[in-house]
């Protein structure tokens, strides 16, 4: 994890001092992972700052979850539950909300609903207002017709 964050996000210590997982303690792995989360948070905050004064939406999907010692498993190479619940978020500017209130209303209505990464494609198309024969609004979190894929 150490290569995924810089000094500004190196808060949790001790962190990884080796690329060999077996050489690291549970605490080092957790701290290193937490530092990567700080780096991701900072990155997303920087993007939001760039978009804040525009009519814009940001959609973030993590590509996978992470195992942090559950059942003795670490990282994301094994098939287990934490990998099936990756992080996701949608942020929109005030200007986007003023321009597309129905889209924002639908996103708010769907905010606690489960989603799969397969909905990302349809959500992005719908949020951008791209109408296409391949757009499935039942797979879009921007739609009142959303149904978990």
PLM region spans:
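Catalytic domains that recognize anionic headgroups
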Residues: 1-149
């Amino acid at each position: 994890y150490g290569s995924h964050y810089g000094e500004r996000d190196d808060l949790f210590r001790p962190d990884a001092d080796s690329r060999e997982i077996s050489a690291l303690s549970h605490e080092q792995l957790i701290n290193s992972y937490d530092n990567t989360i700080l780096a991701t948070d900072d990155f997303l905050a920087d993007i939001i700052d760039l978009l804040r004064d525009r009519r814009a939406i940001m959609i973030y999907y993590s590509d996978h979850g992470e195992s942090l010692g559950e059942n003795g498993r670490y990282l994301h190479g094994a098939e287990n539950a934490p990998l099936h619940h990756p992080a996701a978020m949608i942020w929109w500017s005030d200007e986007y909300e003023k321009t597309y209130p129905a889209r924002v209303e639908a996103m708010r209505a769907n905010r606690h609903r489960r989603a799969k990464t397969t909905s990302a494609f349809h959500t992005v198309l719908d949020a951008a207002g791209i109408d296409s024969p391949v757009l499935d609004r039942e797979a879009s979190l921007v739609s009142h017709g959303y149904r978990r894929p």
